[in-house]
Amino acid sequence: QGYSSAASDVYKRQALVLVSASTLMYAQESQRDIRRADRKAQRDAERARLKAEEQAADQVAYQQAVQAIKDKQFVLEADQVIFKRGQTAFVSSNTNFVMLNGQRATVQVAFNTPYPGPNGIGGVTVDGTTSDVKVTTDKRGNVNCNFSVQGIGISAQVFITLTNGGNNATVTINPNFNSNTLTLSGNLVPLN
């Protein structure tokens, strides 16, 4: 009987060790799950904060761009050109822009080509006076600005659309010297 009582004690101890070990493992799993959930909640909160900051900055940029259009004091710095058949190319905003400064406007397009072009940098520049400036806002908050530029010997019709929620805009240029309508995309910023 002493032997069976000792074996029973060993089994009880083993059962107690197994129960303790499984409880400890479950507690560690629970702690790991809690830490994982905390990290996920922190990441989600950080993403939400960054998204809210980005939306606020975009809204400020949009308001500044709208005011610049109303004041007729802006530059659309194009970083992408969309050709007639839909092909796109990235371009330099230093040489591809539309500027409106009161009654004067400059429309310059220049592509990275080995040919100098009429403006000496591989494209065309129309610099002159504006006429027929019209600014409208649609029901979604997109702002449209249309005007004509009359330069020396050449002119162009300019159609700008500023999308609501940021300062990203597109401009369509219809020059009088050819039928190659160009669409540029970039940021519209106030003229400093």
What are these regions (language model features)?
Residues 132-192:
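Helix-rich interaction surfaces within compact, conserved domain-sized segments
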Residues 1-11:
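Single conserved hydrophobic/aromatic residue that forms the stacking wall/gate
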